[in-house]
Each structure stands twice: as structure tokens, then as C-alpha cells.
UniProtKB/Swiss-Prot annotation:
Expressed by the skin parotoid and/or rostral glands. GO terms for cellular component: extracellular region. The keyword Secreted applies. The major product is Caerin-1.1; in addition, different peptides are produced that are missing some amino acid residues at the N-terminus. Caerin-1.1.1 is inactive. This is Caerin-1.1.
């Protein structure tokens, strides 16, 4: 379903987003 798609997208996106956010913190 839509949630599983969002979940798989999040798994690909989060590893790239988290380090960027951490740099600004």
C-alpha cells in the first residue's frame, strides 16, 4: 500500500537527510 511505499522511500532518503540535519545542529 501507500504506507509501504512511503516506508521504502524513507529508508532511501533518511540516510542522506540525517547527516545534513546533524551538520546544522
Amino acid at each position: 500500500g501507500l504506507l509501504s511505499v512511503l516506508g521504502s522511500v524513507a529508508k532511501h532518503v533518511l540516510p542522506h537527510v540525517v547527516p545534513v540535519i546533524a551538520e546544522h545542529l
